[in-house]
Amino acid sequence: MPSTNPAATEIRVLLVTGAYYPEISAAGVQCRAVATALRGRVDCSVVTTSVDPALAATEIIDGVTVHRVVLDRGRRLSKVRASLRLVTCLLRAARHCDVVHIHGVSKKNVPTTVLARWLGRPLVLTLHTSGQDEPAAVRRLGRAAYRAFMSADLVLSVSPSLRERYREASGPAKQVMLTPNGIDTQRFRPAADAERLVLRRSLGWPDTQPVVLFVGFFSRDKRPDLLFRAWRRLPPGPVRPKLVYVGATGAGYYEIDESLAGRIRAEAAACGCGGDVVFAEPTNEVERYFRAADVFVLPSAREAHPLALLEAMACGLPSIATRLPGATDAIIEDGIDGRLVPVDDEAAIAGALSVLLADRGAASAMGVRARETVLERYDISKTAEKWLAAYHTVLNRN
């Protein structure tokens, strides 16, 4: 039952997301950070799917109870069993919450929405992913999915572009709150020179060779291969910058194209630069890479409100991103706290890289301004307050 004690100080919220720590997804990372920031005011629990059968079905992480339903995407019977377990898990967890908060669009949305309505729980939906969390894409999933998508009591959007697309479909009466992703600016912070040197050595990087960093899944939308081609365009110099990729390259996540990393490795070997191209699998200590690198590049063709870009900026790392209306251009002011380049323009990326690598003073100043932007607009405390306001809004309505 929902809490009826007026003296109760904590709102009980069930977060429903596609992946959660130690597995990695942008929504899951954001859920964990906000749950930590709201500790003492909001009692969060999590229902999530997992592709790792070694993880516990239920465990407590950072004081948050996490319920997992394991799914083998390659086996139809596994999907059927997982669906049944998910409904059971959702029913048990939702009975003990005041608000149900769905993150993103997936097959979990329909049963979650039905159960929330049956139990009389207000429903919040956050739009996280460009393309996937948009009305046109959800319509293709069928009438039930679209009805669930449009029926949330309150919709939150991480980016202006996602908010506008939802509003176009729902009409002006539907409230859609802009709630940008937030960053733990204590965890993601610049490293002093001595600490940075220690970090580089711990990662196996040379002390002085410049490092260009990519962080993200190896999906076609992320364009890791475009960055490789741009990196190869850099003019010859006494020291070739190292290109470091941090992100999942293999099966397990539906977004990943396994051929991308293979092609990059093959092309790097063929041109004799394989030693300067490094692949690191996903890590829950990604801040070590941001704090040790020289330049970050986000070459994506599609993003909503990219966490990796915010994390890089919070670490004072000069960053280059493709100009995506209502997404990256809502974060970066070109030439001030980062660089924006056209989508799919490897020459433009190479040119921006050349400038930042050549003028380290200007790059450093850009990194300082980038951190100031994150501190002012995207600290996790600001996101947490917006989520809390959303919970109070739907509870007051109900």
Cite the ranges covered by each PLM segment.
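Aromatic "clamp/platform" in nucleotide-sugar-dependent glycosyltransferases that forms part
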Residues: 282, 301
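Short hydrophobic beta-strand element within catalytic cores of glycosyltransferases
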Residues: 318-322, 332
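An aromatic- and histidine-rich active-site surface loop
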Residues: 54, 83-85, 99-119, 125-127
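A short, well-ordered alpha-helix in the C-terminal region of glycosyltransferases
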Residues: 355, 362-377, 383-389
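A short, histidine- and acid-enriched strand-loop-helix "catalytic/donor-clamping" loop
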Residues: 20-24, 74, 107, 123-139, ...
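Conserved donor-binding/catalytic core segment of Leloir-type glycosyltransferases
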Residues: 14, 206-222, 228-231, 243-246
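Conserved acidic donor-binding segment of nucleotide-sugar-dependent glycosyltransferases
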Residues: 333-335, 339-346, 355-361
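Carbohydrate-associated surface elements
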Residues: 50, 161, 182
